[in-house]
């Protein structure tokens, strides 16, 4: 806005500064002087429709348009628009944009109607635009078919330019309508064409001379130059006969001028910090890669790293460091950020550094397993199902009941959420989050048909269903554990050893295990056979059938003396080493043992034998599902625990990603499938895995538990997986019923985030 003595003037697309803002459209009082000015006073009206001496003087100097000139100008513009609309060649004449024409003080330049005024240097304004438009029209004429219309083009040379004139609002609206119908404006025609995302990562040509870059912050296009670069480049224009116009814009080969990061929300770091990492990425690209647009490539890669960080500074810094390292070592692929996603599905294996970090986390967790309730060494009690467990306390309402007569005790009223301490003045005492009632106020907010219980003592758990130790000898032959009695006898944990399972001396597999251990002790230590990577070989426990079966046939039925004599045979050492290591994991061509990582999550329900396994889910390090089945419990089902297990029917199959139905399996079949996936060297990842291992009745010491990895400030309680996923992954989980696949993937991603920084 601009205020003067005559009133208020407003710069807008629909009002020229030379016109009064509040003058009437018909000019009824244009020739009458203002009464206030005539009386010698100052006009205080902001919408005075009368004439003022200042405006009359200005119009006399600039020249006012008569009614005849206005009518003639309207007629000329209308004829030009009619010629353009009736041109059968598709409208070769170009009209400027309506908004641009209204913003200009002078008459807009319309080809075929008028020309632009001359500048101070004598050169016609817009002459360069006319030359560019004429060259474009000549190229289109060459591509036209012989059947094209021969209507002559209406063009006026720059020498016949008309004096500057005004354009009424009605004419501007007509120009705007015609522009929407296909008449392109010169501002749109001469817009800067930004290079596409594919062109950014093309190698630079030595023949092209360096050109000056464009500042992306001063771009006149609706989108910024960086956003235009991120999207796919526009397809070349097509003529009417279908031929593609491949003429590139003069500015399509220009790089960004400044290294300025793109603003995003939430921002993971400050602008100076992002600029520092952006310069490091650009320096790496300049030193190791010869790209056509190194600055634009650096800006896009830094923006991708900032988006992946989800506002976390530690994740952002690690993403940038990994990106710079991948560019320097040559593993980076332009436009795909392959170096920053080494632990995702885009990568086929994990580097040795990540494998070493996982081993270090597992070794730190191992001393803390016993105090966190993991089954380390339960006493080897006699296996078999008890006839009477006795009096137990309900796991929900804490009432005592007789397990065989549970149906006679009536319903169970309970609170499904744990009691919490009030953190404000409105709730200072303990309360239940499920109903916001203080502790002791009511019996419960939900009701179940019967009471349930859960065994906590490991000896009692081993008495109901025996534990099995995950070891090398367990995966030699899964067919030997078909019956419950045989598997229980051969897999009961020993009190003398916490690493391997205790087997009777009469077991045939014992001689083979002892012979392999003796052969292992005789061979010298070889550093080349140490684990180098994980998940870069075949599937876990994928072994050669001929060698394994032949070895088992030799081991079964032989005594210890026969096994010792067989060790001193002339069999090659390489073959015996391959046979010894094959069952415990996958081996590469060099014979080195591969360490695997499996994320596990189990769901449990209440039965007459306590809490049993009802669903097991296993995924690999890349998030691929390897096992997801519903397990039929051994005891009688008392409660499905649907709120936390997500199971409402034990016979309902699980639909896999391929569309196949996974029917429910028995507990013995679940054991067999689990032992195919894990071995002694496998690292199990999960949250609160002590409950999962107890439900699976497995003893394992290579564990990465996120509840131990991220302890809460209160030692009495552990941090929930939902809290960890929201804090480190910006992911909301467990909004409804628990999903074992969702929980396993969240725990695995939390561990990956911990490895990154």
From Swiss-Prot:
Principal EC category: hydrolase
GO biological process, one term: rRNA 3'-end processing
UniProt feature, compositional bias: Basic and acidic residues: 120-132, 543-557, 565-581
Key words, A-Z: Cytoplasm, Exonuclease, Hydrolase, Nuclease, Nucleus, rRNA processing
Entry's Gene Ontology cellular component terms: cytoplasm; nucleus
Segments of this protein annotated with the region Disordered: 56-259, 474-590
Low complexity: compositionally biased ranges: 244-253, 474-502
SUPFAM superfamilies: Ribonuclease H-like
Principal place of residence: cytoplasm
Subcellular location: Cytoplasm; Nucleus
This enzyme's EC code(s): 3.1.-.-
Polar residues: bias regions: 145-172, 202-223, 230-240, 503-516
GO terms of molecular function: exonuclease activity; nucleic acid binding
Domain Exonuclease: 597-751
Record's function text: 3' to 5' exoribonuclease required for proper 3' end maturation of MRP RNA and of the U5L snRNA.
Annotated family: Belongs to the REXO1/REXO3 family.
Protein name: RNA exonuclease 3
Organism: Yarrowia lipolytica (strain CLIB 122 / E 150) (Yeast)
């Amino acid at each position: 806005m601009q205020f003067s003595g005559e009133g208020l003037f407003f710069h807008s697309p629909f009002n020229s500064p030379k016109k009064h803002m509040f003058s009437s459209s018909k000019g009824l009082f244009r020739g009458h002087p203002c009464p206030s000015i005539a009386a010698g006073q100052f006009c205080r009206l902001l919408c005075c429709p009368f004439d003022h001496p200042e405006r009359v003087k200005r119009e006399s100097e600039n020249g006012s348009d008569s009614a005849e000139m206005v009518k003639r100008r309207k007629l000329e513009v209308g004829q030009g628009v009619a010629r353009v609309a009736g041109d059968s060649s598709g409208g070769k004449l170009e009209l400027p944009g309506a908004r641009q024409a209204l913003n200009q003080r002078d008459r807009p330049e319309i080809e075929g109607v008028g020309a632009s005024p001359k500048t101070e240097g004598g050169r016609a304004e817009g002459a360069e635009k006319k030359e560019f438009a004429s060259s474009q029209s000549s190229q289109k004429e060459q591509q036209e078919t012989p059947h094209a219309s021969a209507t002559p083009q209406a063009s006026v040379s720059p020498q016949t330019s008309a004096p500057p004139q005004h354009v009424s609002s009605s004419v501007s609206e007509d120009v705007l309508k015609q522009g929407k119908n296909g008449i392109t404006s010169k501002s749109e025609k001469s817009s800067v064409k930004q290079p596409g995302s594919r062109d950014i990562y093309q190698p630079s040509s030595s023949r092209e001379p360096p050109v000056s870059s464009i500042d992306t912050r001063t771009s006149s296009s609706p989108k910024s130059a960086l956003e235009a670069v991120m999207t796919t480049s526009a397809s070349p224009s097509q003529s009417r006969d279908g031929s593609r116009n491949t003429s590139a814009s003069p500015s399509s080969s220009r790089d960004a001028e400044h290294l300025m990061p793109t603003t995003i929300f939430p921002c993971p770091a400050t602008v100076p910090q992002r600029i520092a990492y952006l310069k490091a990425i650009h320096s790496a690209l300049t030193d190791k890669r010869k790209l056509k647009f190194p600055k634009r490539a650096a800006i896009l890669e830094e923006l991708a790293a900032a988006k992946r960080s989800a506002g976390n500074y530690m994740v952002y810094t690690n993403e940038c460091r990994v990106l710079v390292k991948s560019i320097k070592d040559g593993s980076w692929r332009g436009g795909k950020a392959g170096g920053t996603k080494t632990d995702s599905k885009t990568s086929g294996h994990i580097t040795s550094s990540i494998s070493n970090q996982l081993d270090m986390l597992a070794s730190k967790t191992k001393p803390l397993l016993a105090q966190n309730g993991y089954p380390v060494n339960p006493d080897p009690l006699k296996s078999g199902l008890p006839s009477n467990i006795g009096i137990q306390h309900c796991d929900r309402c804490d009432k005592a009941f007789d397990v065989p007569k549970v149906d006679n005790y009536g319903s169970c009223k309970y609170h499904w959420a744990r009691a919490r301490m009030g953190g404000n003045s409105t709730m200072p005492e303990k309360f239940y989050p499920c109903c916001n009632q203080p502790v002791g106020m009511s019996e419960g907010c939900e009701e179940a048909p019967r009471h349930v219980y859960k065994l906590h003592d490991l000896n009692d758990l081993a008495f109901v269903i025996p534990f099995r130790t995950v070891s090398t000898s367990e995966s030699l032959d899964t067919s030997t554990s078909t019956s419950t009695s045989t598997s229980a006898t051969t897999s009961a944990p020993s009190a003398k050893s916490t690493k391997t399972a205790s087997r009777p001396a009469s077991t045939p597999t014992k001689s083979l295990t002892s012979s392999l251990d003796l052969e292992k002790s005789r061979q010298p230590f070889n550093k080349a056979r140490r684990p180098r990577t994980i998940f870069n070989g075949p599937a876990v426990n994928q072994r050669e059938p001929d060698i394994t079966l032949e070895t088992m046939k030799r081991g079964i039925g032989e005594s210890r003396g026969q096994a010792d004599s067989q060790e001193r045979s002339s069999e090659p050492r390489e073959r015996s080493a391959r046979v010894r290591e094959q069952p415990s994991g996958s081996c590469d061509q060099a014979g080195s043992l591969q360490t695997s990582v499996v994320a596990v999550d189990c769901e449990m329900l209440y039965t007459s034998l306590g809490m049993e396994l009802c669903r097991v889910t296993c995924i690999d390090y890349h998030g691929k599902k390897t096992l997801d089945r519903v397990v039929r419990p051994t005891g009688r089902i008392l409660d499905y625990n649907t709120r936390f297990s997500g199971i409402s029917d034990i016979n309902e199959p699980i639909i896999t990603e391929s569309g196949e139905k996974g029917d429910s399996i028995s507990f013995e079949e679940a054991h067999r499938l689990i032992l195919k996936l894990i071995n002694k060297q496998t690292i199990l990842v999960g949250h609160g895995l002590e409950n999962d291992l107890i439900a699976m009745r497995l003893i394992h010491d290579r564990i990465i538990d996120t509840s131990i990895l991220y302890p809460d400030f209160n030692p009495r309680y552990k941090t929930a997986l939902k809290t960890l996923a929201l804090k480190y992954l910006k992911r909301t989980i467990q909004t409804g019923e628990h999903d074992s696949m969702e929980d396993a993937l969240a725990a695995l991603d939390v561990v990956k985030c911990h490895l990154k920084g």
